[in-house]
Amino acid sequence: MEGNSGGAAGNDVELLCKTLQVEHKLFYFDLKENPRGRYLKISEKTSATRSTIIVPFTGISWFLDLFNYYVNSDEQELCSKELQLDSKVFYFDIGENRRGRFLKVIV
């Protein structure tokens, strides 16, 4: 995951914060608000790196719908998808390596 909010973090107010640990990775879900509006900040932290994407508030339900598609669909049906929200395009893709399958989200 990669990206940035494009704004000054000093004006941001944290409305909700949740943390999820999956194997050796930590995922942070922060609902925040600044003068431009609300947004969801999703960060993935490993021992060496931290990657972040910002989802505009108006697109959170669309983002979650696509995420659920990958979680609940049969392996054979899965294909790459993209989601345009405001001026951002999110690319969803399934990857696989020696440790297993994963969902890759790129902005």
Language model feature labels by segment:
Residues 1-107:
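Positively charged, low-complexity terminal tracts
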